[in-house]
């Protein structure tokens, strides 16, 4: 049953996810495409994690954080993709209240964690390029673990703020969520809580996360650019640029899409456009990150070649 009656109102116990389309043919096409993307995402990111773990030459802070970013990408994509694939195969796409809660928390947690990890990786590049003599001290194992734990705590706190905004919501009747997953904005639109909707915790925490992480990334790359421009060696400049290009690409893709969805005025784009961009940053970007970080990284390509050669000739 979708509703439970009590003395005061009708409580929703499940939601209907309207998804991306009602067209049966398009559903089959999207199912095939997104399934392929998800399989590439999982295999690509797990391969990245395994390669970093087994290759001693990749046991550096940058790759330590990259392996955790790959883990986050698997978790982030798995938050919505399996359920979305299952919904393509059924006529009525439903999700329980508990399932919606878990999806909301997981999406906020992994999304926030990705923000913090991207900022941490920018700081790591700043230390490596601008203060190379202090790198082993500034980015020691203890410091890396502290930064990682801080990122996870930040992700948990921001995700908890989403639950603080979600739990007080009252759903008096309509339970059709105009999205393919449980995001806070369409859930608030669906609620009958009126002007008392407690969206302040989620809004404040999310804004804080975005401002802080963007500030760290911007300051880090400003100093990196200044340092690179001061280099006299062309080879040194090219090496420094190649080190940062992949990370900057990942940052631009991720922050560009979340800015489109969460920062731009809602009147400037339609709900369907919102859904398409959401698919890009929750499904496509996790697939692209392993490619972005490996194609332009000679150390990763070299480690992969050595591991393959070892397997072939062993």
Swiss-Prot record:
GO molecular function, one term: olfactory receptor activity
Transmembrane portions of the chain: 29-49, 58-78, 103-123, 137-157, 200-220, 241-261, 275-295
Keyword Protein biosynthesis attached: no
Location(s), subcellular: Cell membrane
Disulphides: 100-192
Highest rank taxon of the organism: Eukaryota
Record topology, Cytoplasmic segments: 50-57, 124-136, 221-240, 296-314
Signal peptide: none
Keyword Glycoprotein on entry: yes
Entry-listed glycosylation sites: 8
Extracellular side, ranges: 1-28, 79-102, 158-199, 262-274
GO biological process, one term: G protein-coupled receptor signaling pathway
InterPro entries xrefs: GPCR_Rhodpsn, GPCR_Rhodpsn_7TM, Olfact_rcpt
GO terms for cellular component: membrane; plasma membrane
Coiled coil location: none
PROSITE patterns from the UniProt entry: G_PROTEIN_RECEP_F1_1 (PS00237), G_PROTEIN_RECEP_F1_2 (PS50262)
Keywords: Cell membrane, Disulfide bond, G-protein coupled receptor, Glycoprotein, Membrane, Olfaction, Receptor, Sensory transduction, Transducer, Transmembrane, Transmembrane helix
Similarity-based family: Belongs to the G-protein coupled receptor 1 family.
Job description of the protein: Potential odorant receptor.
Protein's recorded name: Olfactory receptor 5P50
Species per Swiss-Prot/TrEMBL record: Mus musculus (Mouse)
Encoding gene, per UniProt annotation: Or5p50
């Amino acid at each position: 049953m979708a509703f439970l009656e009590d003395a005061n109102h009708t409580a929703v116990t499940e939601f209907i996810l309207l998804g991306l389309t009602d067209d049966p043919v398009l559903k089959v096409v999207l199912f095939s495409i997104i399934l392929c993307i998800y399989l590439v995402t999982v295999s690509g990111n797990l391969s990245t994690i395994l390669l970093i773990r087994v290759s001693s030459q990749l046991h550096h802070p940058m790759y330590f954080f990259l392996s955790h970013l790959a883990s986050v990408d698997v978790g982030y994509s798995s938050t919505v993709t399996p359920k979305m694939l299952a919904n393509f195969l059924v006529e009525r796409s439903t999700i329980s209240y508990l399932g919606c809660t878990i999806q909301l928390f997981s999406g906020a947690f992994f999304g926030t964690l990705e923000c913090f990890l991207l900022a941490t990786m920018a700081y790591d590049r700043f230390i490596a390029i601008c203060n190379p003599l202090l790198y082993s001290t500034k980015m020691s194992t203890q410091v890396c673990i502290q930064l990682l734990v801080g990122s996870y705590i930040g992700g948990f706190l921001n995700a908890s703020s989403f639950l603080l905004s979600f739990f007080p919501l009252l759903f008096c009747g309509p339970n059709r969520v105009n999205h393919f997953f449980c995001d806070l904005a369409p859930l608030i639109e669906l609620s009958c809580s009126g002007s008392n909707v407690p969206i302040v915790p989620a809004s404040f925490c999310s804004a804080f996360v975005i401002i802080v992480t963007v500030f760290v990334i911007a300051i880090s790359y400003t100093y990196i650019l200044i340092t690179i421009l001061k280099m006299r060696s062309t080879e040194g400049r090219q090496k420094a640029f190649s080190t940062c290009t992949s990370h900057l690409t990942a940052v631009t893709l991720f922050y560009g899409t979340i800015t489109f969805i969460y920062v731009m005025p809602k009147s400037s784009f339609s709900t369907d456009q919102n859904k398409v961009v959401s698919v890009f940053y929750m499904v496509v970007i996790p697939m692209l990150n392993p490619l972005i970080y490996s194609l332009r990284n000679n150390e990763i390509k070299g480690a992969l070649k050595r591991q393959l050669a070892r397997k072939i000739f062993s």
